[in-house]
């Protein structure tokens, strides 16, 4: 169930076979999962329920298990660069763990599956999102 979403987007597939779906709304999106049943149908599961991601600023992104997801209202954005950071226990401080360039869809939604080495070895958060236009110019930042 994706609530009153006007658009449903397939984001990716989890390692356990669950399909990850996003239901787009005007001010955010839902993330839910579904598993195949009887060969041709999909059944909603609670295995990867992430609930509602409100986007109250121009651009927002999160790490949902092993997938970066986000939405931007920068209408000229064609890609975003997401800078991830994770907690370093040895240094007792946050450190940058990666920078990922992700294409932006017509609806402003963007997503990317992280490599298992990043997703499984460190607890990541999105430190900064940089929006770029077709010319590669920075047109917005959210940090």
Where are these regions (language model features)?
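Long, contiguous interaction/targeting segments characteristic
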Residues: 1-54
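Ser/Thr-rich low-complexity repeats and stalk/linker segments
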Residues: 3-6, 39-40, 51-54, 59-66, ...
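Short beta-strand-to-loop capping motifs
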Residues: 22-24, 72, 113-116
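A mature extracytoplasmic/lumenal domain signature
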Residues: 24, 74, 84-86
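Short edge beta-strand/loop segments characteristic of extracellular beta-sandwich folds
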Residues: 66-74
């Amino acid at each position: 169930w994706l609530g009153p979403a006007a658009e449903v987007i397939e984001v990716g597939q989890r390692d356990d076979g669950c399909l990850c779906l996003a239901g787009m709304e005007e001010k955010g999106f839902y993330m839910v999962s579904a598993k195949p049943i009887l060969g041709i149908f999909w059944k909603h599961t609670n295995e990867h329920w992430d609930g509602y991601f409100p986007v109250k600023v121009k651009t927002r992104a999160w790490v949902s298990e092993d997938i970066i997801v986000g939405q931007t209202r920068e209408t000229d954005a064609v890609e975003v660069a997401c800078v991830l950071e994770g907690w370093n226990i040895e240094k007792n401080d946050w450190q940058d763990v990666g920078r990922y360039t992700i294409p932006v869809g017509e609806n402003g939604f963007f997503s990317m599956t992280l490599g298992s080495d990043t997703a499984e070895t460190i607890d990541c958060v999105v430190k900064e999102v940089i929006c770029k236009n077709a010319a590669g110019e920075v047109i917005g930042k959210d940090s």
